[in-house]
């Protein structure tokens, strides 16, 4: 998730490129406005850019019109600037209801949740890359979708080892779109 930039995204992108792994970067409106160079790297290096809404508000608390505006405003700004589509939506904070899912589907989004996450958005809570590698590997499972926030120094340092460890356990990293094919 890319709510704001903390200086680790280039390292994350370098690791993903080195390990030949594609991912989805979920961005908000402020991130889109302030991080053109990084978003260009996302697109140019073959990653997906997902819709995390303009203002990162709890979707169930919004009216239908407000929820649609949150998605469509960001989508329009992204598509106009980068000539690419947003295919995935992740509800801010994971908060959603049936109406949220219905709106996203009507706007032709695939809603992507996660099957593993931890409190890595707390950027001052540093536990070291070994902690991340151990936590991910202990929770590894088929079809795993890992939610990492790019603001974490631990994630940036651990990513290469996480990929290597999971591959060593027999897991493969696929194109995110493949997870949603019928």
Regions found by a protein language model. Give the residues of each.
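Divalent metal-coordination and catalytic microenvironments
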Residues: 1, 16, 49, 89-92, ...
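Active-site beta->alpha N-cap acidic-glycine motif
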Residues: 1-62, 66-86, 172, 178-181
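Alpha-helical scaffold elements lining the catalytic groove of polysaccharide deacetylases
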Residues: 6-11, 57-85, 95-142, 155-161
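A generic structural signal for well-ordered alpha-helical segments
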Residues: 16, 42, 104-107, 166
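Short, solvent-exposed turn/loop segments enriched in Gly/Ser/Thr/Pro and often Arg
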Residues: 28, 90-97
């Amino acid at each position: 998730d890319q709510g704001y930039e903390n200086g680790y995204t280039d390292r994350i992108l370098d690791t993903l490129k080195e390990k030949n792994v594609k991912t989805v970067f979920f961005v908000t409106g402020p991130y889109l406005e302030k991080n053109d160079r990084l978003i260009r790297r996302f697109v140019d290096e073959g990653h997906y850019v997902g819709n995390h809404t303009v203002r990162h508000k709890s979707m169930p608390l919004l009216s239908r019109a407000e929820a649609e505006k949150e998605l469509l405003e960001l989508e329009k700004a992204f598509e106009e600037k980068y000539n690419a589509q947003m295919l995935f939506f992740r509800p801010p904070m994971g908060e959603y209801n049936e109406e949220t899912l219905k709106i996203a589907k009507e706007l032709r989004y695939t809603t992507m949740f996660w099957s593993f996450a931890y409190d890595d958005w707390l950027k001052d809570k540093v536990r070291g890359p070994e902690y991340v590698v151990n936590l991910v590997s202990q929770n590894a499972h088929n079809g795993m979708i890992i939610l990492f926030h790019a603001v974490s120094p631990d994630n940036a340092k651990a990513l290469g080892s996480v990929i290597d460890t999971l591959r060593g356990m027999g897991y493969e990293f696929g194109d995110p779109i493949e997870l949603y094919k019928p």
